[in-house]
């Protein structure tokens, strides 16, 4: 009886093992077949049953909160997946770009993009709940008039640079129907740029990156040369980290929403920024909040927004108009303001009618170090100036109050009553 029982048990185990091996072999064959069918054409319509999904490459759980007294609510700004610099490619599909072709991605998933091509567009046209992650693995795309990456629809698209890649558009952009696709990377929905390698973007006649929703950058290295704005967004630009070398014939970072005055803000948590811009290095129509980072900005104006708050960071600005400018760019924000709570600011102004820190409203200094070199105006404001702490140095001399604004006028042979006499001090109200 015992022998018979043992025989039955052993037989069952053998049958079970054989079935498992057969099943695994079938799965392997199916996966291989799916991958080859995806890479063999110019148009990709991904099969969601075999592609990666949002949970495979980092949770969308919110883990970030910025400066608690900030002018921007940063509570839900970055998710864990936004901040994850490498993609989970265990279930990813590998696609290769080719000349004159469009890679069309229609399903949520992780896609590793390889190869070199001319006039090739990676087109994401997925469901509005889909999260699509493009992993650039040594990609080089050069187009005449169309975006290299075009996100038509998705809940969110991640562009993750896994190996050094280059995207270029050499001519004027051609519209896609009613959509003015004016950037090398153009997205109608939320866009996240991250990664561990360098992405070079060249735009001969347009923007480098355009997002019609939110644009977030959480890591990676970005070398952007553009005829217009280097990074532009309708709703917001939020930067957690990254290294940026930007040469722009317009603005370096630009956020503006003409339909909703509560949007159009820029938030910077950290990163390293070298920006050369003919207009503004960083412009927001509503709020600009800087919580950290290292900045070397050369532009007509360094920072411009309706309300500006600087809480930390090492900031060097060389400007030909205003170093930091708080001006009424949005009626919803209220009175323009500049608030400096920390950080180290070095502002060097060019010759002419220039202001190092200029606000059409109120200036408040609570902390930090402000070192200004200005032949004309160090501070200019239409409202009030409040000095509660920190260090202010003007042309090498430390002062213990914010100078009064310069009064223009005085005629051909005279000088304005409160003119700064070339020393950067604002009239009679400064204290040394």
Please name every model-derived segment.
Residues 2-432:
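A composition-driven surface/loop motif
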């Amino acid at each position: 009886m015992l022998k018979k029982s043992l025989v039955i048990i052993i037989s069952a185990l053998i049958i079970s093992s054989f079935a498992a091996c057969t099943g695994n072999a079938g799965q392997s064959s199916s996966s291989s077949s799916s991958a080859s069918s995806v890479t063999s054409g110019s148009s990709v319509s991904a099969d969601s049953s075999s592609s990666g999904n949002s949970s495979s490459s980092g949770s969308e759980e919110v883990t970030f909160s910025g400066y608690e007294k900030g002018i921007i609510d940063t509570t839900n700004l970055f998710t864990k997946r936004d901040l994850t610099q490498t993609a989970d490619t265990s279930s990813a599909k590998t696609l290769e770009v080719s000349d004159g072709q469009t890679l069309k991605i229609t399903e949520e998933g992780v896609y590793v993009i390889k190869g070199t091509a001319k006039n090739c567009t990676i087109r994401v046209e997925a469901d509005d709940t889909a999260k699509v992650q493009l992993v650039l693995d040594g990609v080089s795309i050069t187009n005449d008039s169309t975006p290299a990456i075009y996100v038509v629809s998705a809940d969110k698209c991640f562009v993750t640079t896994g190996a050094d890649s280059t995207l270029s558009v050499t001519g004027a952009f051609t519209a896609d129907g009613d959509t003015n696709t004016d950037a090398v990377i153009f997205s109608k929905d939320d866009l996240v740029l991250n990664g561990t390698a360098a992405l070079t973007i060249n735009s001969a006649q347009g923007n480098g990156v355009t997002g019609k929703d939110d644009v977030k950058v959480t890591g990676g290295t970005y070398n952007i040369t553009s005829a217009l704005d280097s990074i532009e967004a309708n709703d917001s630009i939020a930067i957690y980290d990254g290294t940026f070398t930007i040469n722009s014939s317009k603005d370096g970072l630009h956020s503006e929403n003409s339909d909703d005055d509560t949007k159009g803000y820029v938030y910077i948590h950290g990163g390293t920024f070298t920006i050369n811009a003919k207009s503004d290095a960083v412009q927001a129509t509503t709020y600009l909040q800087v919580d950290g980072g290292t900045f070397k900005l050369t532009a007509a104006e360094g920072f411009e927004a309706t309300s500006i708050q600087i809480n930390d960071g090492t900031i060097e600005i060389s400007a030909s108009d205003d170093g930091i400018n708080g001006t009424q760019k949005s009626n919803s924000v209220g009175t323009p303001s500049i608030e400096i709570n920390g950080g180290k600011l070095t502002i060097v102004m060019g010759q002419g009618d220039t202001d190092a820190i200029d606000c059409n409203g109120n200036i408040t200094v609570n902390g930090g170090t402000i070192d200004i070199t200005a032949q004309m105006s160090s501070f200019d404001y239409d409202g009030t100036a409040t000095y509660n702490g920190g260090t202010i140095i003007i042309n090498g001399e430390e002062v213990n109050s914010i100078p009064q604004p310069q009064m223009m006028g005085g005629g051909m042979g005279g000088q304005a009553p409160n003119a700064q006499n070339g020393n950067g001090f604002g009239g009679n109200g400064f204290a040394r």
